[in-house]
């Protein structure tokens, strides 16, 4: 570990004794509930909310109970998620995804896997040879509340690969992982910082001022509504409550361990988590702060634009200010210690630092040379946290050993650190009334930010700094003052005497005048006195009215506004666009509604993409067309298979073709997507023909699950199986249980797929049906009188099929498919335990 310097920034210039009266505790009080919201057509519920009328302070009680109430109701409007998806695929939840993601082997419908639910094996087009995502990647999709420092529910679907096959290699795991389509960059790079950062603060007031860099409401709002870096805010929450009875100074030691670095995609390319998308869909199109505030509670104020997975170590050590002063700690010792260095993992080397060590021991009231603090640890094993809460001043090796053990555990149990954030309203998309809801969520975030403004708090005495924590206010005291209201102790030097002014909360916005609205505030919380400084900032604030923006949105989305303003006449469905479709098409098109066209994958839209429903109930459509920007496979002749299979191919990509079913390829086998977006050579020159083997060529004998192709045995396709015994099996990749046959399981195993037999009752097998002669299975024979298939006796089996292991009457035995099918056909209960002969009989 490298040597680190400690900067002790405490000096005693002068003192002024303060005799302040104690402030009486103020208990939190709820305001009355707002009116009930409009009945939600999807959940058939309505909510109401109450805000805090009086914040608890000076040791008073916080508010008890929930801010929200919900009740059932009868909706007057339908559910927007019941609308269609146009040319795209509709998940069971109502969320729309590209049709190219259907039957690709990936569950792109986040919660229900509807895109893979009804796919036959022959329809599946696996888009990648691996499907294991990097460990803990789900953490990159969580929402984040910047005001509370807490991670919230998922807003990004980190499970979707988007049909892409992007891989990243982990040196620690010695394996490749498949990246989510929502991640732009994901790097496994362990960064352990050996240089511990630590600071010495002369009060909790100094600490909060340092960690909360934005103090005015306007600067807080500017920071809040732009992409910004953020670290955990929870450290400041507890600095004041722990030590109220004395004045304490803080020694803060911190460090980080990084395991992985990530960058999420731009918001327009992110696939939303289905629960979050549903909540966005359910938001009312008329502004109701209660409904939007509930979304903020569940999903936070921001989402993660980038960051690292790792661990964050921070410990706050409290030192009694008066005892430190009594031990004669002066700036002389500070300089001596600073010049020689001080480190908690090496022994003190200078006389000045030794004096500092003794002063810290005496001032912190430690015994056995142990300095105890309050740990704020993110990531790593929970069992290590208690061991990180103290430092042994005479045992630096022990300190290092405990820290290293925690740092090692971070690799397996990381959390998000060093996050860069983007406001949550940037993710409002792919829902009805998207522009209106995006505007309203931004407005709700502004109101939410105002709830945490310290203007709601009563003044702290002796220049203390108030902050809002939940439903109560805390006072962070200046050096050598303490108490619930900072009413006790002394102020040092030029801080004594005066009281600086503080802002009241902003008034409500005025009515719009010439497109602008204003609000005001006063410098009376508290007013400046005794030579104290006046408030910094403006007493009035003006901004553009939302009315103009809402009027513009009313033209784009008239159906999102009150019914009295919505036309009662509607246009038919928008005209079709070749190689394209309408985004978020919906089912109703009132006069004035605009729709936006987009193109299928592999095409780009040229022209004006917006069409408008005119007053004559006809669509006003400008010039537009979908221009090809990539190569698209033509309809291939029967028997030709292509690899890789993709919706489109960019210039320079190659495709190879082969023949199936014992056919051989005539013509070229490789094709290049050229700059003219045509295949070179032309694919029509490739076709499959029946290949006659030379008489002298030895014909290999293939297994039942194989077929002869180009003079060699290759795996059949499942649909090429002849009738075989029905079984239930679990796909170990997707964990889905499917009805298969013994033959199909052999074929899938031949192709490298991992399927495991399950009980017959675990899936729905095809019902037994009477079959005409000529379609009898192995265990059936033709009855001449009825011309129907009937059960064979086991002794009558002619073609036996596969040898399998079957449990009959509790005992396993090897028998042919025909014999097992004969028993099942006659109603006897059997269980297929292996698609191969029993192990005991093959040894």
From Swiss-Prot:
C-, N- and O-glycosylated. O-glycosylated with core 1 or possibly core 8 glycans. Disulfide bonds join 28-63, 39-73, 42-79, 85-96, 91-109, 103-119, 128-165, 337-353, 433-560, 455-505, 457-473, 460-475, 477-486, 512-545, 523-535, 571-613, 599-626, 631-673, 659-688, 702-713, 715-750, 721-743, 728-763, 773-782, 776-789, 791-825, 797-818, 805-838. Membrane attack complex (MAC) assembly is inhibited by CD59, thereby protecting self-cells from damage during complement activation. MAC assembly is also inhibited by clusterin (CLU) chaperones that inhibit polymerization of C9. Residues 106-143, 518-537 are annotated as: Disordered. Residues 107-120 have a biased composition (Acidic residues). Residues 121-132 have a biased composition (Basic and acidic residues). Residues 124-456 form the MACPF domain. Residues 569-628, 629-690 form the Sushi domain. Residues 616-693 are annotated as: CCP 2. This is Complement component C7. The lineage of its organism: Eukaryota, Metazoa, Chordata, Craniata, Vertebrata.
């Amino acid at each position: 570990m490298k040597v680190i310097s400690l900067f002790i920034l405490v000096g005693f210039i002068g003192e002024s004794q303060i005799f302040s009266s104690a402030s009486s505790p103020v208990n939190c009080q709820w305001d009355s509930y707002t009116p009930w919201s409009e009945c939600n057509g999807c959940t058939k519920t309505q909510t109401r909310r109450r805000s805090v009328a009086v914040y608890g302070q000076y040791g008073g009680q916080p508010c008890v109970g929930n801010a929200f109430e919900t009740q059932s109701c009868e909706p007057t409007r339908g559910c927007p998620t019941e609308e269609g998806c146009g040319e795209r695929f509709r998940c069971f939840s109502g969320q729309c995804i590209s049709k190219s993601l259907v039957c690709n082997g990936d569950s792109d419908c986040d919660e229900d896997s509807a895109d893979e639910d009804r796919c036959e094996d022959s329809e599946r087009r696996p888009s990648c040879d691996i499907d294991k995502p990097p460990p803990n990647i789900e953490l990159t999709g969580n929402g984040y509340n910047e005001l509370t420092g807490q991670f919230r529910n998922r807003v990004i679907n980190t499970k979707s690969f988007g049909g892409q096959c992007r891989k990243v290699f982990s040196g620690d795991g010695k394996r490749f992982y498949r990246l989510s389509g929502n991640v732009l960059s994901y790097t496994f790079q362990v960064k352990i910082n050996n240089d511990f950062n630590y600071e010495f603060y002369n009060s909790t007031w100094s600490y909060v001022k340092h960690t909360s860099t934005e103090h005015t409401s306007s600067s807080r709002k500017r920071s809040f509504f732009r992409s910004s870096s953020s670290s955990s805010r929870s450290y400041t929450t507890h600095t004041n409550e722990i030590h109220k009875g004395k004045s304490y100074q803080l020694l803060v030691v911190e460090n980080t361990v990084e395991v992985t670095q990530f960058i999420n995609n731009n918001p327009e390319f992110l696939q939303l988590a289905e629960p979050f998308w549903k909540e966005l869909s359910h938001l009312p199109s008329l502004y109701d702060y209660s409904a939007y505030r509930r979304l903020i509670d569940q999903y936070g104020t921001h989402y993660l634009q980038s960051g690292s997975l790792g661990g964050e170590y921070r410990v706050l050590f409290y030192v009694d200010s008066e005892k430190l002063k009594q031990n004669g700690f002066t700036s002389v010792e500070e300089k001596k210690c600073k010049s020689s260095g001080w480190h908690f993992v090496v022994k003190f080397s200078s006389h000045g630092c030794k004096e500092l060590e003794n002063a810290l021991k005496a001032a912190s009231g430690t015994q056995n040379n142990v300095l105890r603090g309050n740990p704020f640890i993110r990531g790593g094993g929970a069992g290590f946290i208690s061991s990180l809460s103290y430092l042994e001043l005479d045992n630096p090796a022990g300190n290092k050993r405990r820290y290293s053990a925690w740092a090692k555990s971070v690799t397996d149990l990381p959390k998000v650190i060093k996050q860069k954030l983007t406001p949550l309203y940037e993710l409002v998309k792919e829902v009805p009334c998207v522009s209106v809801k995006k505007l309203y969520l931004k407005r709700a975030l502004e109101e939410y930010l105002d709830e945490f403004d310290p203007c709601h708090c009563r003044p702290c005495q002796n220049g203390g700094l108030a902050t809002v924590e939940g439903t109560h206010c805390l006072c962070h005291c200046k050096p050598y003052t303490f108490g619930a209201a900072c009413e006790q102790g002394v102020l040092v030097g030029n801080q004594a005497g005066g009281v600086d002014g503080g802002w009241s909360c902003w008034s409500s916005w005025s009515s719009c005048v010439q497109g602008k609205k204003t609000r005001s505030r006063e410098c009376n919380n508290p007013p400046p006195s005794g030579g104290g400084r006046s408030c910094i900032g403006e007493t009035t604030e003006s901004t553009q009215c939302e009315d103009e923006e809402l009027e513009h949105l009313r033209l784009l989305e008239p159906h999102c506004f009150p019914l009295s303003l919505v036309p009662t006449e509607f246009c038919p469905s928008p005209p079709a666009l070749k190689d394209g479709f309408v985004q978020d098409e919906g089912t109703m098109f009132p006069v004035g509604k605009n729709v936006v066209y987009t193109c299928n994958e592999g095409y780009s839209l040229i022209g004006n993409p917006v069409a408008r429903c005119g007053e004559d109930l006809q669509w006003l459509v400008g010039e537009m067309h979908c221009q090809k920007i990539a190569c698209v496979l033509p309809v291939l002749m029967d028997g030709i298979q292509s690899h890789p299979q993709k919706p489109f191919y960019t210039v320079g990509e190659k495709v190879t073709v082969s023949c199936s079913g014992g056919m051989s390829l005539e013509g070229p086998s490789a094709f290049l997507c050229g700059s003219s977006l045509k295949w070179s050579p032309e694919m029509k020159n490739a076709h499959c023909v029946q290949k006659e083997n030379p008489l002298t060529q030895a014909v290999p004998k293939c297994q039942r699950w194989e077929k002869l192709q180009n003079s060699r045995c290759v795996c059949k396709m499942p649909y090429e199986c002849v009738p075989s015994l029905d079984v239930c099996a679990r796909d170990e990749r997707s964990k889905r249980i499917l009805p298969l046959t013994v033959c199909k399981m052999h074929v899938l195993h031949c192709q490298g797929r991992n399927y495991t037999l399950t009980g017959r009752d675990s899936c729905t097998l095809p019902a037994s049906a009477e079959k005409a002669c000529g379609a009898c299975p192995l265990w059936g024979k033709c009855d001449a009188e009825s011309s129907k298939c009937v059960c064979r006796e086991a002794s009558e089996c002619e073609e036996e099929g596969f040898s399998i292991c079957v449990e009959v009457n509790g005992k396993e035995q090897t028998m042919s498919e025909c014999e097992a099918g004969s028993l099942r056909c006659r109603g006897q209960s059997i269980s297929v335990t292996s698609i191969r002969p029993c192990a005991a009989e093959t040894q």
